[in-house]
A protein has these predicted regions:
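Long hydrophobic alpha-helical segments typical of transmembrane helices together
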Residues: 207, 213-223
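Structural detector for internal amphipathic alpha-helices that build alpha-solenoid repeat scaffolds
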Residues: 1, 19-34, 52-67, 77, ...
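Positively charged, hydrophobic/aromatic-enriched amphipathic segments
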Residues: 11, 17-24, 43-44
Length: 240
């Protein structure tokens, strides 16, 4: 590929059209693997004061062996990007890289506490998708149930759905959220998550029955869904 074609790809990184950006990123990922000069140019773009080039450059460089800390820092910052598609693309990349790089896992745990609400939420989704089974990651999810931002609490609640080892204390936290959280979105999510954990307590079942008669349509819907999940689990064949 000649210099004009390469320059055109770099120009496409500034496009307002996401498919155009994505096509340029994909082509540059392939080209940069065999062209150190392109990697150097992309590294310079990490310091782009306007910010438009930064996340695409970091995304491309992250596909090379041994990405720098600067690359990871830009990607972490991109988890706060206003465009959800970009956030999720970066999230998927970070999850893939974190499976073989413990430093990224550490950065995600740190971001869960120190980031913006959007970053904290995306960090939780990353932790969820890593399918971690250790007590530290479980505690991180439980700690985020107390986050000030309701969207972060929703992310924490939904990320607990597939986790094993949630003890009575964790279940009590979810129950309290279902009954008392000031945001209905969080309560709705807690109802379904608790139901999916199995072995519902009597007080949870009673609270679901009350919620079925709520004046809030979404809460009624969540309670009905939770009760349906519980019923299906009870009627499922043993060991099935």
């Amino acid at each position: 590929m000649d210099e004009n074609q390469t320059a055109a790809l770099f120009a496409d990184l500034e496009s307002s059209n996401k498919p155009t950006i994505r096509a340029a990123v994909d082509k540059l990922v392939k080209l940069t693997a065999d062209a150190p000069t392109l990697a150097d140019e992309l590294s310079r773009l990490l310091d782009d004061s306007r910010g438009k080039h930064r996340w695409p450059a970091a995304y491309i460089l992250a596909h090379l062996p041994h990405p720098s800390q600067r690359v990871f820092n830009v990607l972490i910052n991109a988890l706060d990007h206003p465009d959800a598609d970009i956030r999720w693309a970066v999230m998927l990349l970070l999850v893939r890289l974190a499976k073989t790089d413990g430093e990224i896992v550490r950065l995600l745990f740190e971001l869960r506490e120190t980031g913006t609400p959007t970053q904290r939420r995306m960090a939780l989704y990353c932790i969820r998708d890593l399918n971690l089974t250790d007590t530290a990651s479980l505690q991180a999810l439980l700690d985020s149930l107390r986050d000030d931002d309701p969207t972060v609490r929703v992310a924490a609640v939904t990320s607990l759905k597939g986790r094993l080892g949630i003890d009575s204390g964790g279940r009590k936290m979810l129950y309290d959220i279902f009954v008392n959280d000031p945001d209905l979105r969080v309560r709705n999510a807690a109802a379904v998550t608790l139901a999916q954990l199995g072995a519902p307590s009597g007080e949870f079942l009673a609270a679901l029955k009350l919620a079925e008669a709520s004046e809030h349509a979404q809460l009624r819907k969540a309670a009905t869904a939770a009760l349906s999940i519980i019923q299906k689990r009870r009627s499922a064949p043993a060991g099935g």
